[in-house]
């Protein structure tokens, strides 16, 4: 079964790998472990955005090192980048001060990843690029794209992998209702599916702080 993987990069990061030693994740090994053997992984599409490094100048360096590691080690890997937008917003204070009820702060938002993922999921269905699509996210904004695939391509299968390293927690009901199967990406799989510290045939190394 031709299977394409669609990864919501920031949902994966915040749901499963942030604060863990498992950031050097081998995507192909991960889905080979999670999925049954009849799945032939033909593409791994990763939707994310480049971090700014405003708070940590080395953060974009580590991120790009990881991207290069995946590109060098995984022929099926494809990278699709959205953007970060920072703009001032004015919000009410939770505990107003005398003469001050509002504060203006800088708000940073990631734009494009969920839309890009949804567009690729639908377009690939129309192009007959997969028999099964596996969505790695718990973002309910993707529900409509999944619903349309089910409606217009009833022979195609949809899987949902929700990133959750701890036991407990639940997949989005809006997403799971459109999935033929639902899997959890937990700490055991994360620990077992790390890239080599040095990518063979390259000079790419796992960042020391990871």
Please describe what each predicted stretch is:
Residues 81-210:
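Nuclease catalytic cores that cleave nucleic-acid phosphodiester bonds
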Residues 1-108, 161-167:
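Domain-level signal for Mg2+-assisted phosphodiester chemistry and nucleotide/NA-binding surfaces
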């Amino acid at each position: 079964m031709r299977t394409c993987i669609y990864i919501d990069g920031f949902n994966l990061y915040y749901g499963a790998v942030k604060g863990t030693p498992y950031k050097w994740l081998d995507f192909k090994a991960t889905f080979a472990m999670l999925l049954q053997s009849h799945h032939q992984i033909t593409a791994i599409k990763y939707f994310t955005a480049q971090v700014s490094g405003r708070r940590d100048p080395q953060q974009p360096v580590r991120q790009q090192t990881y991207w290069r590691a995946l590109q060098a080690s995984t022929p099926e890997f494809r990278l699709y980048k959205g953007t970060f937008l920072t703009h001032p917003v004015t919000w009410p204070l939770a505990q107003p001060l005398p003469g001050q009820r509002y504060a203006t702060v800088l708000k940073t938002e990631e734009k494009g990843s969920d839309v890009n993922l949804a567009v690729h999921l639908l377009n690939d269905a129309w192009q007959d690029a997969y028999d099964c699509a596996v969505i790695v996210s718990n973002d309910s904004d993707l529900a409509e794209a999944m619903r349309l695939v089910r409606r217009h391509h009833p022979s195609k299968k949809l899987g949902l992998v929700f990133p959750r390293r701890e036991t407990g927690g639940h997949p989005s009901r809006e997403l799971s209702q459109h999935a033929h199967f639902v899997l959890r990406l937990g700490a055991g799989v994360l620990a077992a599916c790390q890239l080599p510290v040095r990518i063979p045939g390259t000079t790419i190394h796992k960042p020391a702080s990871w």
